[in-house]
Structures are given as C-alpha cells and as structure tokens.
Amino acid sequence: MSKETKIFLIISLLVIILIIYLGFQEPSEPQEFVKNKTFSNYSTLFFDYEISRYPSSVEIKPLEAVNENITLGFVTDPWNINFGIIPGNGTLVKRTVELTNLKDENSKVILRTYGNISPLVSFSKNNFIMHPHEKVSIEISLYDNDTKRMNYTGEIDVISKKAIYNFLPIS
C-alpha cells in the first residue's frame, strides 16, 4: 500500500469519525434558566430535537414548633413545574406532565433537570420511546430528604428526539 493511500485512508477515517460525532451530539446544558415555558429546536446530521424548557423551583421551609402555622404555596400554572413552598424533613411533592406524540413516527423522550434543584427531582419514566399518537403521563417528584432549608431553582427540559432518516434507530 502506497504512502498516499495510507494518508487518504487515515484522513477518510478521521472525517467519518467527525461526521458520526457531530451527527449524534445531543443538546447541551442551558447557560441560563428560563423564566417561562420555552420551546426550541436543535438538529444534527441524523436527528431532530424539540425541547420544551420549564422553569422549576421550590422553597424548603424549616419546621418550627409543633403548633406553629406554616404557609404552604402551590403553583397551579400548567406551564410551570414549580413545587411551591414546602416544609422540610422528608416532604414528597409531585407534579404531572401529559405528553402526546403528534407525529407519525416514533420519538424518544428524554427528561433532564438543571440547577441546584436537580438532586431533589426524579421522574416516574425517562429515556423511553413514544409511538405515533401515544399519550403518556409522567410524574415529576421532588423529595426533600433532610435537605438544607433554602430556595432551590433550575430547569426541567422535556426533549423529543426524532430520526431524520427512517433507517436510523432512536436510542
């Protein structure tokens, strides 16, 4: 094999690796958290991403004397995944998000949390495939496991990943 052929093969291999890397790169962590529900789109060579970004926060209050009244706050806005004001010492709070795949192809759903609220949040279902026109209800839980009493903020993203080409698996 000639020297020119070897160089051509090495360059070709590097270009293929670069294309694969760029084609499968997922959306990055947000630089700034949203204040209201926001939609954005992101594409690579192989996949389209639709991202719904939700603000999220909770204020964890200390439990004072047994007979003291404490004000709890609940957020009922459907676009807001805030958990309000809760007492500390093992409180569990849940919010529900309803998702529908309106497309005629499968979509992978990925849920992510960002900010200092992240360690407190969990999902009933994550990293799953939604079939065409399927509806799914997901519980988003926040559990205060003897966490420091303060405000926690961040963002919860619902990412829908769809293959641009039908022959590609969504994984």
Regions found by a protein language model. Give the residues of each.
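Short aromatic-acidic-glycine turn motif
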Residues: 116-125, 163-167
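Beta-sheet-dominated interaction scaffolds and their linkers
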Residues: 37-102, 125-127
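Secretory targeting signatures
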Residues: 1-45
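Intrinsically disordered, low-complexity Pro/Gly/Ser/Thr-rich segments with frequent PxxP/GP/PP motifs
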Residues: 121-147
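Ordered hydrophobic segments in well-structured contexts
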Residues: 96-98, 108, 122, 137-141, ...
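Short, solvent-exposed loop/turn segments enriched in Ser/Thr/Gly
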Residues: 77-79, 88-96, 134-137, 147-157
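Terminal connector regions
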Residues: 27-58, 146-171
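Short acidic, flexible loop segments centered on an aromatic residue
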Residues: 100-119, 157-160
